[in-house]
Amino acid sequence: MGIVVIGDVFIDIKGYSLSPYIPQVRNAGTVIQIHGGVARNVAENIANIELKPTFISAVDDNAMGDDVIQKLKRHKVETKYMKKVKDGMGTWLAVFDHEGDVVASISKRPDHKPIEQILDEHGDEIFKDADSIAIEIDTDKEIVKKTFMYAEKYHKEVYALVSNMTIAVERRDFIRRTACFVCNQQEAGILFSEDYDHMTPAELAAILPDRIRFAKISRMVVTMGGDGAVFVDSDGHTGIYPGRKIDIVDTTGAGDAFFSGVCIGLTYGKTLQEACGIGTRLAATVICTTENICPRFMPEEFGLTR
């Protein structure tokens, strides 16, 4: 069944200013609408490495929802468990400045009950043959609880990322049960109630081993934008994976792509450092385009065997 990805579908509406963005005035630019959502992006990224994931989610019961499912199918994502319901998808509206950074955004979350129903109806068959599980740790709490229940029943590793750290920080008990938790520098500071914003990778690498050991987190990766990522496990092994020098067009989806690479690498036998290398490469391909997913690769390009 491959990697099982659990989470939301969003429709992303993105506006790009052609000159320095000025709030409260009309800024000339372009507006595009694309399929998004953290979990949807992760599922499509994994599929674009020809690894055929299964996606557990919901879409709107309309033509837009049909379009989302058909695109996922074309990319070889297994969609048979997805539900079509009212308010099945969320919406994310974002404005970018001329340098590709988000300057304003609003989001509407979808109804999560359909995903919970999918797990109730098909949980055993979904989890028993999964290679691993990828989930947004800040999704509905009942979904997270059921995910870990089934994952532990069938001895599957769970890899987690976050889109809202203020919710995720209340899920520390679940984060402890993950095989690896991936977040950014600011989110790591929230998790450990500290300020990491001005730390260098070396400074962060020096303190993270104690932080995750005391918190009983098995493995953690903290992304630091252009400075790369710091990775650490509970045995005290730590390292820094450098970032790539690229021209930034749009940073949307870069974190999702990085997480996808880490999840792929760890699921299919790579070390934490090697998995960060896959994530860094995928993130770089997203940042230099307006797309929020990576292009298609063959698994052999990353030393993966199917």
Region locations from a protein language model:
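Glycine-rich phosphate/adenosyl-contacting loop at the front of the ribokinase-like
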Residues: 1-58, 63-74, 92
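Ribokinase/PfkB-type carbohydrate-kinase core domain
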Residues: 1-9, 71-84, 96-238, 298
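Conserved phosphate-binding/catalytic region of the ribokinase-like
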Residues: 3, 27, 198-306
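A general structural signal for well-ordered alpha-helical segments in protein cores
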Residues: 39-43, 65, 90, 144, ...
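Short, conserved phosphate/pyrophosphate- and ester-handling motifs at nucleotide-, phospho-/glycolipid
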Residues: 46, 184, 255
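Gly/Ala-rich phosphate-binding loop of Rossmann-like dinucleotide-binding domains
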Residues: 47, 152, 267
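Short, basic and Ser/Thr-rich N-terminal targeting/leader segments
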Residues: 49, 87-90, 225
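Hydrophobic residues at beta-strand termini and immediately following loops
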Residues: 56, 106, 240-242
